[in-house]
Swiss-Prot record:
One Gene Ontology term, aspect cellular component: plasma membrane
Record-level Gene Ontology MF annotations: undecaprenyl-diphosphatase activity
PANTHER family reported for this sequence: UNDECAPRENYL-DIPHOSPHATASE
Membrane topology: Multi-pass membrane protein
Protein origin, superkingdom: Bacteria
Described function: Catalyzes the dephosphorylation of undecaprenyl diphosphate (UPP). Confers resistance to bacitracin.
Misc remark: Bacitracin is thought to be involved in the inhibition of peptidoglycan synthesis by sequestering undecaprenyl diphosphate, thereby reducing the pool of lipid carrier available.
GO terms of biological process kind: cell wall organization; peptidoglycan biosynthetic process; regulation of cell shape; response to antibiotic
Organism annotation: Anaeromyxobacter sp. (strain Fw109-5)
EC number: 3.6.1.27
Catalytic reactions of this protein: di-trans,octa-cis-undecaprenyl diphosphate + H2O = di-trans,octa-cis-undecaprenyl phosphate + phosphate + H(+)
Name of the protein described by the UniProt record: Undecaprenyl-diphosphatase
Intracellular or extracellular location(s): Cell inner membrane
Length: 304
């Protein structure tokens, strides 16, 4: 992968990770259009690892709130009164909202990874329409301080739905928040805070699984490092822009974006430009391929 492509995909990851439009769909489509084999484990490792850049962006942007929530949660735990303050309640509701995605992600990990591009196209369109319904019919009056246990569970289920490729984690959680009556900005802010435990846990696990794929691949390792750094910087800017946008504007832009992207993806699949499905290659398979022929390029070794 060229460094220019890594920079482009890093910016794309940052924009589509936080906007409710699905980073998975955009990375796979543009990765294919840039000439990369979606089944190549190096590309899939790149696509996974650069997500740590956007994770870092969330941690830096919300660092004050995260530290405050962490301190409040620990103090309430020590006092055995978890709901004693608004901050401690929010901290524990974030933990509660993390449970659905953590449990379902572990149970259905392999099935989710096997889902193909038709599912991505369908998710883009269907959830775009749900976002439109949330925009048009829900009351947008509640703030982050109004989050309760029921809200945390329901938005957490929205986060679990984002395990389906093409759904968009920010898209499903922001939509769920809006359907529950939160303002657009409050729904987005809670979405970002809710993402911290799951992206640290799931992201760390995926990082551990995929980093070995890039061993002995210096050009891919460099491209991944550059893409990750770019996604971190761009991600910070995107978060700031999105929160400002949602204070005064609707989500109609993202509804149109999702539906257009879903239709475009369906056309590309139908025309044979993109595959209907994709194969995933595990780290053990990579090690086996390298053991069979240490001198062969990884892509060629895996195809044997």
């Amino acid at each position: 992968m060229s460094l220019l492509a890594a920079v482009f995909l890093g910016v794309l990851q940052a924009a589509t990770e936080f906007l409710p439009v699905s980073s998975t769909a955009h990375l796979l489509v543009f990765g294919e259009l840039l000439g990369h084999d979606l089944a190549d484990p190096r590309f899939r490792a790149f696509a996974t690892i650069i997500q740590t850049g956007t994770t870092l962006a969330v941690l830096v942007y919300f660092r004050t709130e995260i530290l405050s929530l962490l301190a409040a949660g620990l103090r309430s735990l020590a006092r055995r009164r978890p709901l004693e303050t608004p901050q401690s309640r929010l901290a524990w509701f974030i933990v509660l909202g993390t449970v659905p995605a953590a449990v379902l992600g572990k149970l259905f990990e392999e099935r989710i990874e096997a889902l193909g591009n038709w599912v991505i196209a369908g998710s883009l369109v269907v959830l775009g329409l749900v976002l439109l319904a949330a925009e048009r019919y829900a009351r947008h009056l509640r703030t982050v301080e109004d989050v309760g246990a029921r809200d945390a569970v329901l938005i957490g289920l929205g986060q679990a739905l984002a395990l389906v490729p093409g759904s968009s984690r920010s898209g499903t959680t922001i939509t769920a928040g809006m359907l529950l009556g939160f303002t657009r900005e409050a729904a987005a802010r809670f979405s970002f805070l809710l993402s911290v435990p799951i992206i640290l846990g799931a992201g760390g696990y995926k990082l551990w699984k995929t980093v070995p794929v890039l061993r002995g691949e210096p050009s891919w390792a460099l491209a991944t490092l550059v893409g990750t750094a770019v996604s971190a910087v761009a991600g910070y800017l995107v978060i700031d822009w999105l929160l400002g946008w949602l204070r005064t504007r609707t989500t109609h832009l993202f509804v149109v974006w999702r539906i257009a992207a879903g239709v475009a993806l369906a056309i590309l699949i139908w025309q044979g430009v993109l595959p209907a499905g994709h194969a995933s290659v595990s780290a053990p398979a990579v090690e086996a391929a390298r053991a069979a022929d240490p001198d062969a390029p990884l892509g060629a070794a895996l195809r044997r």
